[in-house]
Structures are given as structure tokens and as C-alpha cells.
Amino acid sequence: MRSLTPLLALLVGALALPLTPLGASAATGAAADEGTYIVQLRPITREAPQSLAAAQTAQYGGHLVGVYEHAFKGYTAQLTAEAAERLKKNPNVLSVEPDAEVHTFAQTVPTGIRRIFGPSNPNLDIDGVDDVRINTDVAVVDTGVDYTHPDLNVVARTNCQTGVCVNNSGTDDNGHGSHVAGTIGAIDNNIGVVGVAPGARIHAVKVLNSAGSGTLSAIAAGLDWVVARAATIEVINLSLGCSGCSSSAISSAITNATNAGVVVVVAAGNSHANTSSFFPANHADVVTVSALTDNDGLAGGAGGSTLSCRSETDQDDTSAFYSNYGSTVEITAPGTCIYSTWRNGGYNTISGTSMASPHVAGAAGVLTAGTRKPTTRAGALAVRSTLISTGNFNWTDDSGDGVKEPLLDVHDATKY
């Protein structure tokens, strides 16, 4: 069951955005008929991406925006549509694709942490007292993260919104990324909330703006930044995506991240639709996460049908009414009325598969902590298999897709 779009945590509808070049206003000095394109170079090309990108943009009359050398070899450039078509025929070029917009899928121990049995695992030591931290690094590719939040352990940040990452820049002016980060790794102290992997080191990669929107080129730059640090980072969370779009460059970036041993976790989307047309949730290498409605933090379905944070009703321990579904979804996790950290040092309760995905990303962080960090594709995919095999089926799948995915379960101290 698997599907991409930033999933707006506030349950916005389908993120079906046309895959058309962004307007010329995206770059100063661009011609009126220019758009932004992502160019993927062939891996066997011997010339350095920087020099080849400069030469090609000059040859085809474009304006170079950013160069990528880690997640994939390529660059982003301002080009006319005619130049982009000619560039596709260059023997050193694998793909040329128009940039497109994407969006977010919109201390107490939160119900989601309780529902996946986090407090039952002594290795996680969730007690609100001694601030034991999980030795793992997770990249949150999102709206940024509140790096001064007292409940978060943010160790690095970069702003990639322009297609070029600027280190030590960018904060969360939306709230979505900070919420995701808290579910992954809020510190187990005596304030606020606690995450699945308490105290996990968060690498904040800002690719989305204050409205929760961004571009494929920003995501490409962000993933390139992460893969360059694959020796340190164990997990990527992508609570974002788009419906009906795709990107060869970003697909390659995800594959190369996996090949480097990084586990990539993606939200399924909030359109109550099949994930087969949602990118990157339909990518073969990612862990795609649907959302469960849990009203009481307990198994058994006895929590009623009234949602604490919404006007809708959704029966306890069932598929969330908004969640995408399908054969590309591997696992489900709590996503409705999740309480977590927020921008400006605050806390907030929101819903979406964006909130389900970081539960799984946090669990992946626990599985890869310390000396268990994978360094190969096989290692990253083994983590995905463990996440799935340790899940339980003590919930009701009423999505109608006929395939019941396991519910994340981290209670087993011999595995987590």
C-alpha cells in the first residue's frame, strides 16, 4: 500500500498540481518565456557537474540556479521551453523536467506515542525525568524546524527553497516541520511532549515556504544536501508530495539515498485516494505511511468516534477518513489529532498522514541508532522490513482497498 505531495497537516484536499514550469519570476533576470527545469546528467558522464552545468546553460542560453553532485548528478536552470527540448537530446543528459509546486500534507505522552507502545519499551526510557536521548540523526525535509525550541534537539539546518541550500539559514514560518520533528524526537524532559526517538538529532532541511508550498527543485536540492551527509544521517522524513506528478531526478535521489543506507519515510497523502498516482509515496524504495485515527492512545477500538480536535467523527482504531490507501502503502501509524511541537516554541494539535509518517521515521531512527546505522541499500531495506514485520494488526482497516497494512508497534525491546 504506498504514494508524494507535502501533505498539509490541516487535511487539505488532493494536491493535484500541474507539472508545468514555474514562471520567470522565480529567477531575477530570466526571460519572459523561461521556466525552471531540473536537469539530470548521466551517471557515467566524466566531466564534473559544476563545469558541465555551466557549459550547458551557456550553450543553450539559460541561467544556472543550482548544481547537485550527491543525491544525483545534475542542476537546476532557467531555460526556454525550446532550449529545454534541445537539451534533452544532449548525450550527457538523462532527463530534463519542468519544476513544479508541491505542498505539505497537512510534557504529556501524546496518544500516538502511546498507541504504538512507546512507553512499553524500556530502551526508549520515556519517563519525563532523565532526558535519555536516542543516538540517531533524522533529516526533516519540510517547512523548516524551530531550531530554538526547548523540546527539540536541532543540530543542523539549511534553507534550500531557491534550489541552492544555504546552511545555518531558514526557520519554520509555518509550523508543519516543527510538528513533524517533535513526533520524531521531542526530548524526554519535564516539559511539552516526547517523541518516538526521544532527543534524536534533527537536521532541518527547509524546502517549503510559510504556506507549506515549495518546488521539486527545492526538494532535489534538499535531498542532495542530505545524501552528502549520509555518513551521519540515518533517516529522511518527507511529509510532502504531489498528485499526478513525478520527477526522474528526485526518484534517483531517493534511490541513491537508499543505496547509501538512509531510510526514506514518506506520508501517503490526505486525499482518500489510491497512492499509485502520488509522488514520492509511490516510489519503490520508500516506506509509505497511511494514517490511523486513534482517540485514546489505547488498542481495542473503545475510544469512541468523536475527534478531540475536529468537527468530523471517525471511529477509534480505524483508517483515518482522509488517508490515502493502496498497494504501495506498507504501514500505518496514528495521524489524527496529534499533539506535538510547533513554531515559536509552542505546541499544537493537527491531523494528516504528515503526522503519521514521523511516527515511523522516529521508529526507523531507533532501529538505526548508534552502531546499527546501515551503510548499504540492503541495510536500509532491512530496516523497512523490520518496521513492517514488527507491526500489529489490532485495528480496523475500513479503507476499502482490500489490503491491511500493519500498525507501527515499537514495544519489542529486542528489536527497538
Q: What kind of feature is each model-predicted range?
A:
Residues 107-201, 218-221, 228-235, 239, ...:
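Active-site core segment of subtilase-fold serine proteases
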Residues 23-30, 52-67, 72, 88-137, ...:
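Protease zymogen maturation seam
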Residues 43-46, 72, 83-84, 100-104, ...:
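Solvent-exposed loop/turn segments at secondary-structure junctions
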Residues 37-39, 76, 95-97, 137-141, ...:
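Structural recognition of the beta-strand scaffold that forms the well-ordered cores
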